């Protein structure tokens, strides 16, 4: 947690397999709109002004590339991180499996004491006929909420949150919970919810 001009900077880094919607997640939240046209492989760093309990913070949002080609470069963005979001797509079972096999071990190696949340993305595709047909052809099905909650508990995540960058359902909750994970003592993080806290955000350009 670093000091900014008049506000504390909170650093949030998003990790996970490629093509699970990490960049769209960040762009939809930062711009309050789903990117309809070109979506870059990696999202530019944005700072969002966040007010929590009357105090102002700058939430820095950092994207990462999930492909193996970036395995050596990706950890360079990890120092000074306050919270990680480990993302998987609820319609990509392989990305769900890789949370435990790839992403948790990587964070344990490079940032063992930093809190992290488990995020299920692309929930708008859970009932999409074409997506379901594709999964059925592979003898697979979407990841359900209970599976996400169970994995979050197994890996020691602060919580499990599902969202859709397209519809923005659950999107604000993702970042509200990320902020709470940073500002709440570790032993209380899992059970602590938004409660009466007022969290207001605006994009800093």
UniProtKB/Swiss-Prot annotation:
GO cellular component entries: actin filament; extracellular exosome; Golgi-associated vesicle membrane; membrane raft; plasma membrane
GO MF assignments: GBD domain binding; GTP binding; GTPase activity; profilin binding; protein kinase binding
Annotated positions of the Cysteine methyl ester modification: 202
PTM characteristics: May be post-translationally modified by both palmitoylation and polyisoprenylation.
Pro-peptide positions on chain: 203-205
Membrane topology according to the record: Lipid-anchor
One Pfam family matching this protein: Ras
Alphabetized UniProt keyword annotations: Cell membrane, Cytoplasm, GTP-binding, Lipoprotein, Membrane, Methylation, Nucleotide-binding, Prenylation
The UniProt record lists the keyword Membrane: yes
Localization: Cytoplasm; Cell membrane
BP GO terms, sorted: actin filament organization; cellular response to insulin stimulus; cortical actin cytoskeleton organization; endocytosis; establishment of cell polarity; GTP metabolic process; insulin receptor signaling pathway; negative regulation of protein localization to plasma membrane
Chain residues carrying a lipid of type S-farnesyl cysteine: 202
InterPro entries associated with the record: P-loop_NTPase, Small_GTP-bd, Small_GTPase, Small_GTPase_Rho
PROSITE patterns in alphabetical order: RHO
Binding residue positions for GTP: 16-23, 63-67, 121-124
Notes on how activity is controlled: Regulated by guanine nucleotide exchange factors (GEFs) which promote the exchange of bound GDP for free GTP, GTPase activating proteins (GAPs) which increase the GTP hydrolysis activity, and GDP dissociation inhibitors which inhibit the dissociation of the nucleotide from the GTPase.
Sequence motif Effector region, location on chain: 38-46
Binding partners and assembly: Interacts with CDC42EP4 in a GTP-dependent manner. Interacts with ARHGAP33/TCGAP. Interacts with CDC42EP1, CDC42EP2, CDC42EP3, PARD6A, PARD6G (and probably PARD6B) in a GTP-dependent manner. Part of a quaternary complex containing PARD3, some PARD6 protein (PARD6A, PARD6B or PARD6G) and some atypical PKC protein (PRKCI or PRKCZ). Interacts with EXO70 in a GTP-dependent manner. Interacts with GOPC.
Role played: Plasma membrane-associated small GTPase which cycles between an active GTP-bound and an inactive GDP-bound state. In active state binds to a variety of effector proteins to regulate cellular responses. Involved in epithelial cell polarization processes. May play a role in CFTR trafficking to the plasma membrane. Causes the formation of thin, actin-rich surface projections called filopodia.
Similarity-based family: Belongs to the small GTPase superfamily. Rho family.
Protein name: Rho-related GTP-binding protein RhoQ
Organism (species): Homo sapiens (Human)
């Amino acid at each position: 947690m670093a000091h900014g001009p008049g506000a504390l900077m909170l650093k949030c880094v998003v990790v996970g397999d490629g093509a699970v919607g990490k960049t769209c997640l960040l762009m939809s939240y930062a711009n309050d709109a789903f990117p309809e046209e070109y979506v870059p492989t990696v999202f530019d760093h944005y700072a969002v002004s966040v007010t929590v309990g009357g105090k102002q913070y700058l939430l820095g949002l950092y994207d990462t590339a999930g492909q193996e080609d970036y395995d050596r470069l990706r950890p360079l963005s990890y120092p000074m991180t306050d919270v990680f979001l480990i993302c998987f797509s609820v319609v990509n079972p392989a990305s769900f499996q890789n949370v435990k096999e790839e992403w948790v071990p990587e964070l344990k190696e490079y940032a063992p004491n930093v809190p992290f949340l488990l995020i299920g993305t692309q929930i708008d595709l859970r009932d999409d006929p074409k997506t379901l047909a594709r999964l059925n052809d592979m003898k697979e099905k979407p990841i359900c909420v209970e599976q996400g909650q169970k994995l979050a508990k197994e890996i020691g995540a602060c919580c499990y949150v599902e969202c859709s960058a397209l519809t923005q359902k659950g999107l604000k909750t993702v970042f509200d919970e990320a902020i709470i994970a940073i500002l709440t003592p570790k032993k209380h993080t899992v059970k602590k919810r938004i409660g009466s806290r007022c969290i207001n955000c605006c994009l800093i350009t």
